[in-house]
Every structure is written in C-alpha cells, then in structure tokens.
C-alpha cells in the first residue's frame, strides 16, 4: 500500500517510543512515523512492516497500512492507560476475562505465524471502540527464529529463559497480573529503586522463582503457570483461561 494520509505535525501528539513518534490522524487512526535516522530505528521499523505483512488481517491484531510517511494504525485506548485512568476495580471481571481470552487468542495467532512479539504487556495492547483488545507494536520483534531487537519490560522478563515462545508466555503472566490488579509485578519497588537497581533486583527475584503473591487472584493458576514454565504454548494458556 502506498497511499499517504492527510497529516501534519500540527496533529495531536500521542506518544514517543524507542523507534518512532506517533500522532493522531483522526478519531479512528494514528500514524507511526517512519524514522529518518538511526540504524537500530530503521531496522526495527522494517521488522515491524515485515511483521504486519506476515500477520495480515486478524481481529486481534491492530490493522496496519504502510505509507511513505509511516504506518497508519487503528487508534485505540492503551490497556495500561485504561487500567490506570479508570482503576482496575471499575472494570467488571467478565470484561477482564474476555480480554484475557482475546489476548491469548491474539498471541497464539502471532506465534502461529512465526513471530515472537518480544515485548508482551498491557502497554502493547489496545482496547478498540467495541471493547475488544488487539496487539500493537512489532518494532523489533523476532521473525522465523531471528533474534528480536527489543526485549520485555523489567517486570516481564526472567533471565536465562531466552527470547522465544516461553518468554512471551512468561510476559503474558505479568500482563494478566496487571490486568487483574491494575499494577505490574513488584510495582512497590519502583519508587524506592532507580531503574538499573530495579531491573537487577527483580531479575534476581524471578531467577529464584520468587514471584509476587497471587493466591487471592482469579487468574492465580494461569499467572503461576506462565511464570513457572508450566505451558509450552499460548494455546495451553488460553485453554486454562477458558476454564476459569
């Protein structure tokens, strides 16, 4: 696709990421600008295009159109932002369960196409106008066994696991924790440690299989399964979520 959007820098700023800057095009779409410099940024952007081409159309993947100026993507509400703005208690359990199932469905599809997302989390899932969730941000993902250029958040990565299906599943467990509680795992450490120390401490805890308590959570068994290596595929995760 080579059409160009009606767009100017005067449009609303949405976000700035590692690779690109995102602006609103209209009420339904955003544009993720093509990076103009930086080898890493260019490589990650090219991988994102390849990922969207590989994934094609799927109801759990935000639709993408490639233009000269950037990627035109569906505009939704960031799941993390929604949890923080309305509060997790304001979202009914039935809706959280639906989103968990849909996210598992989306990640299963991503894996079936030979793609490892490599940054699974509530920050990379949007809620659309119909209250369904979709995955976004494949900049730097891994395709067909290639090493990803990106990695997970500090609260979603276990050292030594390697980047692949199992690491995506581990991060999915942290995503479920945040979906239910409104906070990332070990969020209470964020205010007392700088980022370098925070990463080191949490990675050490995860390496020793010391995870936040989940016994009182509805997703407890699935979260624990993701963190403890119970699952070999996200389809198994989806199956157990469906039993809740």
Feature-to-residue mapping (PLM):
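C-lobe/activation-segment region of protein kinase-like
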Residues: 132-134, 139-236, 240
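Conserved hydrophobic alpha-helix
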Residues: 103-110, 176
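Catalytic-loop of the protein kinase fold
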Residues: 107, 111-128
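ATP-binding glycine-rich loop module of kinase domains
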Residues: 5-57
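Conserved structural core of kinase catalytic domains
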Residues: 56-99
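Hydrophobic core positions within the conserved protein kinase catalytic domain
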Residues: 52, 104-107, 223
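Protein kinase-like catalytic core scaffold
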Residues: 29, 60, 71, 134-137
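Conserved hydrophobic "DFG−1" position in protein kinase catalytic cores
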Residues: 24, 33, 73-75, 127
